[in-house]
């Protein structure tokens, strides 16, 4: 549910240091920039908890599964689907897979498959040996989840993002700018949501660490904007297997108070 925006920085850094290149959503942290693998399969576990402006807490468990295919040197295609369990009073998930406010109900538990997400990422040529890395990503989220269970708004959402990083020695600062275009579900007043993230990635021992500050405008005027800090560590644990651990802390009522998870990625050349 977090931070595909930071993957491009980690990718550029790893490529510059070791000739090995490694994104919401979080599974793409390992996948996005891997230039040595043609197909990447990922799965893991994510837990988040927060009040989202409501008196009662909402807990969300996500078990994601994703595939990413490097079609050419400059084009990557991806798809992801997740099993979701949500417990709390705000039981309608918005375009960012977080509860929408304004739905006061008794505390409920709902679960099932979420929306199907598909993406395409274009790596902009910056010249051989250039320290710059620029990725442009478009994503569509299709309403395949159960609307009656509150796991989707029932409408198609779109997003675009630009990720820019610059390699300096063993680290790479990065910035990401994005925009999510929400569908228009009946009875729910949603608005489009810009986002921004700034941070850095660095080689640490046999792995890589990334930290960032993330902001996203709330999809609803009833909610606060999301402000959070994020950190992740990723390393190779076998020839074709990477392990990533991550966590974030919310700085506003519009973000989860805490979020954390792990991700395993298998790579095929």
Task: Name these PLM-found stretches.
Residues 188:
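Active-site cleft segment of glycoside hydrolase catalytic domains centered on the general acid/base Glu
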Residues 1-33:
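Cleavable N-terminal export/targeting peptides
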Residues 21-169, 173-184, 193-232, 240-246, ...:
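Transmembrane beta-barrel domains of Gram-negative outer membranes and organellar outer membranes
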């Amino acid at each position: 549910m977090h931070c595909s925006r930071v993957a491009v920085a980690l990718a550029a850094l790893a490529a510059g240091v070791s000739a090995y290149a490694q994104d919401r959503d979080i599974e793409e942290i390992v996948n996005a920039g891997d230039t040595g693998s043609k197909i990447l399969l990922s799965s893991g576990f994510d837990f988040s908890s927060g009040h989202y402006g409501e008196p009662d807490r909402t807990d969300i468990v996500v078990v994601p599964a994703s595939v990413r295919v490097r079609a050419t040197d400059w084009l990557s295609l991806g798809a992801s689907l997740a099993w979701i369990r949500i417990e709390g009073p705000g039981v309608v998930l918005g375009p960012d897979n977080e509860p929408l406010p304004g739905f006061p109900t008794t505390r409920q538990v709902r679960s099932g498959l979420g929306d199907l997400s598909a993406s395409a990422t274009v790596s902009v040529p910056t010249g051989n040996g250039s320290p710059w890395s620029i990725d442009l990503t478009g994503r569509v989220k299709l309403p395949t989840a159960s609307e009656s269970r509150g796991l989707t708004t029932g409408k198609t959402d779109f997003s675009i993002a630009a990720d820019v990083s610059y390699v300096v020695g063993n680290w790479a600062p990065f910035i990401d700018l994005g925009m999510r275009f929400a569908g228009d579900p009946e009875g729910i007043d949603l608005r489009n949501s810009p986002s921004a993230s700034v941070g850095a990635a660095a080689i640490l021992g046999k792995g890589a660490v990334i930290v960032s500050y993330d902001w996203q405008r709330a999809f609803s005027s009833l909610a606060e904007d999301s402000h959070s800090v994020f950190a992740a560590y990723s390393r190779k644990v076998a020839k074709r297997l990477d392990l990533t651990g991550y966590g974030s802390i919310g700085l506003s009522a519009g973000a989860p108070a805490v979020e954390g998870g792990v991700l395993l990625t298998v790579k095929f050349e």
